Amino acid sequence: MQLVIISGRSGSGKSIALQALEDLGYYAIDNLPASLMAPLIDELREGPPSRTHIAVSIDARNLPDALRRFPVLLEEIRGRGIQCQVVYLTADSRILLERYSATRRRHPLTRASEMTLAEAIEQEQTYLAPIRDIGDLVIDTSSLSVHELRGRIAEQVARHSGRHLTLTFESFGYKRGVPLDADMVFDARCLPNPYWDPQLRGFDGRDAQIVTFLEAYPDVRAMADDIRHWLERWLPAYLASNRSYLTVAVGCTGGQHRSVYLVEDLAHHFAQQMSGVRLRHRELGVQAALPEDGNAVS
């Protein structure tokens, strides 16, 4: 039996993620009390053999004590031979406020208290910390559309099996903050910046003009090589620890030139050596899977 547990901040897309899994054949249960997880597994194990892929969502409406005990519960479930993934969805608090304002829905924690919406959003994050801290996959939906979130769930959750590592390289601009789902971050702001050349400003790091500019500087190649060597040294250790996902983020000031160039270079290099490589340019709104020949497939 494979169990996917969806949790995260209200308004971050848990219902969309659960629906995406249901559409892909998972037996889906929304807002399951954590205390009923073990009895549910026992019942489903005795049920139809077709129910081998289960998806449940857990949110902050659980009692705080139940949420604090979640890590222990998860260990008990895995100890019974259940293959279990915890997917945690989050988003910037400002984005969540905007989403609630747009839909005019009430936050779950404001229904039985006098908390403001902003207070409820922050309190919920505290309640869910035990789940967030042990999440196998953390997805920041701040800049994702519904379609993009469904695609991410299909790519990174439903298609996952066995000891396969999905390696994502993501470019970003520090102006908009570090991606919340990044496992490691490299800062490229020390490299020469094409932005200050008016003739290059309108291009991005995928364009030949920017590639030529950056590759004229030895430090650019040196940084790319250093990141590559570090990953080649430590990727086997991540695989050995049963890690399923690894997101390597590279940032520059605006996320248009230097970080994009480095992510393209790194992603195509590793796609020649392994499957499961993806690239994402946050500020350009681009994401793609790379087959082992290194050619992107959006």
From Swiss-Prot:
Keywords: ATP-binding, GTP-binding, Nucleotide-binding
A GO term, aspect molecular function: ATP binding
InterPro entries, A to Z: P-loop_NTPase (IPR027417), RapZ-like (IPR005337), RapZ-like_N (IPR053930), RapZ_C (IPR053931)
Highest taxon of the lineage: Bacteria
Keyword set includes Acyltransferase: no
Positions in coiled-coil regions: none
Binding site for GTP: D59, A60, R61, N62
Pfam families: PapZ_C (PF22740), RapZ-like_N (PF03668)
Keyword Transcription regulation in record: no
Binding site for ATP: G8, R9, S10, G11, S12, G13, K14, S15
Disulfide bonds: none
Function: Displays ATPase and GTPase activities.
Family classification: Belongs to the RapZ-like family.
Name the record gives this protein: Nucleotide-binding protein Csal_2229
